[in-house]
Amino acid sequence: MATTRRADMFTADGKPSDDDPRENGPTLGDERTTLVEALRCQRLTLEIKCAGLDAEAMARRSVEPSTMSLLGLVRHLAEQERATFRVLMAGQDMPQLFRSETHPDGDFDGAVPDPGVVVEAWDAWRAEVDFATRFVAEAPNLDITGNDPLNKHGSGGGALSLREVLVGMIEEYARHMGHVDLLRERIDGRIGQ
C-alpha cells in the first residue's frame, strides 16, 4: 500500500490537482456566512475522501473492533442532517433513514458492500444536505429556534438556536472527518488534509 501525495485527495474524481475546492468559498463574512462556509467545507471533505471508491471499499470496516466504515459514516451523517434540520429545526415528523428503535446502529450495521446501498446512502445524504442548505439560507436569522426534547441544558429548556445547531453540525462533521482520514488511509494509503 503506497502513500499518495496529499494534493491527490483534493479532487472529487480522485485525479491529482493542486486546487482544493474547499478554498473556493468566502474568506470574509458575517457570522452566518462563516458558519455556513465551515459546514460546507466539512461536507465537501466527506465527498472528497470517499471519491473513487467502490462499494467494497466504502463498506470496509478497517479499524476493528469498530463497525465504522466510510459508508456507515455517510449514512450516519445523513441521519444527523435529517434529525437536526428537518426534525429539530423545521419541526417535520420524519422517520429515521437507516436506524430504528429496534436497530439503533442501523446506519453502521446496514452499511454493506452493495452498490445500491452506496447509491441510496449518497442520495439520502445529498437530499438532507440540500434541505439543510435551503433551510439555513431561508432562515430570517440565526436566532430562530427548534425544539430538542433531549436538550435540558441552559435557560432555554429544549430550545436550540440555529446558531447552536450550525456549530453542533460543524463539530459532528469535524469529529467524523478524523475517522474518515484514518479509514481512507487504511483502505488505500491515500492521505490528505
Task: Identify the residue ranges that each predicted region occupies.
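Short, contiguous alpha-helical
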Residues: 2-18, 22, 32, 36-106, ...
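Acidic/histidine-rich alpha-helical segments that form the ligand environment
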Residues: 105-146, 163-169
